[in-house]
Design a protein with these regions (language model features):
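Active-site residues of response regulator receiver
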Residues: 61-62, 89, 111
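The feature encodes the CheY-like receiver
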Residues: 14, 65
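Short, flexible helix-to-coil linker/hinge segments that flank and couple to helix-turn-helix
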Residues: 97-101, 107-152
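Short amphipathic alpha-helix used as the core "switch/output" element in two-component signaling
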Residues: 70-82
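Active-site beta3 strand of CheY-like receiver
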Residues: 48-59, 64
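Basic, Lys/Arg-enriched C-terminal extension of HTH/homeodomain DNA-binding domains
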Residues: 186-206
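Helix-turn-helix DNA-binding segment
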Residues: 141-180
Length: 206
């Protein structure tokens, strides 16, 4: 069986709506739906790669019942490199686009994109290509030169700020003290020529 994909999204209506559209208008077969990453990983670990229902593509929401969809994509990329991941989200700011790329996703598409765009995205990814919507490409190009001059932790903090995360959330996620985050943030501001968080978001979020 070809054209097999799974959908991982914690909203039942989204999963069912995507499945209905894709199976009615394309040759894709949505064999499995999951509302969390644990069940998806557990299922894949028990499924032989040669099985006819082994997926070519996963459509993954960024946020899954409090979980991080990016972490799922990282684990898929590491443990199942033959599976291609498409991030599907309401968020289309620079921080999310950067993190999707870093996690190993082949595409990032907004949930408000037209159905035809999603189909086009899947076609490209199936052919080993990548996909971003036009306005996302502009965003990525805008920040690509910035990212290259940042350290790993500065980049992590840059992405987190663009996602609207507080300093405490950044501390918790990166396992850093508040003072350490403040130091990295200060160096980040200096490198990208902004004076504070508000200016960074205004300058680089779109």
């Amino acid at each position: 069986m070809k054209n097999v994909l799974y959908i991982i999204d914690d909203h039942n209506m989204v999963r069912n709506g995507l499945k209905s559209y894709l199976e009615s208008h394309t040759e894709w077969k949505v064999i499995k739906n999951f509302d969390n990453s644990r069940d998806c990983l557990s299922f894949l670990e028990k499924l032989p790669a040669e099985d006819e229902i082994f997926p070519e593509i996963l459509i993954v929401d960024v946020q899954l019942m409090g979980e991080n969809g990016f972490q799922l994509v990282r684990e898929i990329s590491k443990n199942f490199p033959q599976i291609k991941c498409v991030m599907y989200s309401m968020y289309d700011t620079a921080g999310f686009i950067l993190q999707a790329k870093d996690s190993g996703a082949k595409a990032y598409i907004s949930k408000i994109a037209k159905e035809e765009e999603l189909v086009h995205c899947l076609e490209l990814v199936q052919r080993e290509q990548t996909y971003l919507e036009d306005h996302m490409i502009q965003t990525q190009n805008k920040i690509s030169s910035i990212v290259t001059m940042l350290s790993k932790q500065e980049k992590n903090i840059f992405e987190a700020i663009l996602q609207g995360k507080s300093n405490q959330q950044i501390c918790d996620e990166l396992f850093l003290s508040n003072r350490t985050v403040e130091n990295y943030t200060s160096r980040l501001y200096s490198k990208i020529s902004v004076k504070d968080r508000e200016e960074l978001i205004k300058k680089y979020s779109k």
